[in-house]
Amino acid sequence: MKNSEKTLDMIVNLCKNRGFIYPGSEIYGGLANSWDYGPLGVEFKNNVKKAWMKKFVQESPYNVGLDAAILMNPQTWVTTGHVGNFSDPLVDCRACKSRNRADKLIADCEQGQNVDVDGMTFDQMDEFIATHPEVVCPVCGKHDFTPIRKFNLMFKTAIGVTEDSSSTCYLRPETAQGIFVNFANIQRTTRRKLPFGVCQVGKAFRNEITPGNFTFRTREFEQMECEFFCKPGTDLDWFAYWKDYCEKWLLSLGINKENLRLRDHEPAELAFYSRATTDIEYAFPFTDWGELWGIADRTNYDLGRHQEASGKSLEYFDPETNEHYIPYVIEPSLGCDRVALAFLCEAYDEEHLTDSKGKEDVRTVLHLHPFLAPFKCAVLPLSKKLGDKAMEIRNELAKDFMVDYDDAGSIDKRYRRQDEIGTPLCITVDFQTVGDDKVEADNCVTVRDRDTMEQIRMPISELKEYIAKKVAF
C-alpha cells in the first residue's frame, strides 16, 4: 500500500482504537493538539528512542549521552537569541479573528508554491499577502489580515514563591543548549578528544501558532539531538558523514527510500552562522513532504556565544597541534514524535485477501520493524484449558521481551488483532503441546510470522533464541 493511498485518518483511528495514542485530557473535552501515548504507544516510542540511542551512542565510537534539565538559567536563552528572536510571523484574520502563521498561508496558496518562503523577511511576507488576494484565511476563506507581528514561541514560567522579573524562567524550546553549556564538563570528565559528540533525548516546548496533523507538530514534543564537535576545517566532511548516517538509520528501520528525500537549504534559507543545512524529509500521507531530520553545520556560533556571555572558556586544547580553538558543531536534530509518526505511516497497510472458500477480506497490519514493535510476540492458547501452559511460556519469555497474552475469541481473530498492532510473532499453544489421551506431548508450539503469515512448529526450548534473532537491530 503506497503512502499516497493512505490517509491521516487511517493512522489516527488505529492509534486511538488500539491504544497507541489518545487525545490528551479527553474526559474534560481535551486540550488542543495534546496527545497521550497509551500502553502500546509508550512501548513503541520507547523502542524508537532505544533504536536511536543504540546506533548514535552505544554503537558509535564518537558519542556519549546526556540528560540535561528542562529548566535552565534564563540567561541561556538571552544569549542564544531565543528571548528576542525566537518567533513566528503571526497574522490575525479580521473577519473571523482566527490566528495563522503568515509563512504557512503563503506556502499553502496555489501561487505561493514556488515562492521561497523561508528566505522572506516579515516585510516581504506582508507585501506578498497584501498583493495576492488568493492568500485567504483557512477558516473563513476571506482575504483580510492584520500586519504581521512577532509571536515568541517560548513558554514563560516563574521559579519560587513570587513572580517578578528575577523569577522568570522558560521551558526549553530545544535540547541542544543543555549540551552546549555542558561541553567543558563533558570533555573534562570523559577525557574525550575531538571529534566527539553528545546525544540527548528529552522534552522541548514551543507555543506553536498552528500546531496540527496529529503528532507531526505539537506544543510539547520530544527531541533526539546530537551535537558533534569537530576541528574547524573538518566540519563539512563530518556534515556529509552524519547526513549519510542519519539516512541509513531510517532505512535500516524500514523506511522506504522512495519516501525519503534530502533537501539542501538554499543560501537564503541558511542561518547567518550556518555553513550548510540539509533536511531529511518524508512523504507523509497528509503533505507532499514534511521535515523529519535537520542536519546543520552550526560552525562555532553556539559555543562562541556562550563563552562570550558566561566568561567561561569553552575552547578546546588540541594536543596534536598545541592549538586552542572553539570547536565547530554538526547538529543532527530529530523529532521523536515526528519520526514515530513516520514509522507508523510507513508500516500501515491494508491487504486484500481471499480465503480458501473464495471469501474476500481486508487485513489491517502494521509492518513495523520488529525492534520497534510494542510486543515482540503474543502467546495464544488454542483453548482456555491450555491457559496454565500458555501462561508459563508467556512468563518465561517476558523475562527477555515484551509479550502479549490473548485467550479471547477465535485464533484467526486473535491473529488479526496482533497484526493490527504490529506484533511480529504469534505463538500458539495447542493440545499437542501438552498432550492428552489422544496425542503425545511434543513440547512444541506453532509460531506464525506477521508479514508472511507462514507458520512453523518449534520446540519451546528454542523460542527465546528464535525471537531474539527476529527482533534484533
Segment roles from a protein language model:
Residues 1-473:
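NTP/phosphate- and nucleic-acid-binding module
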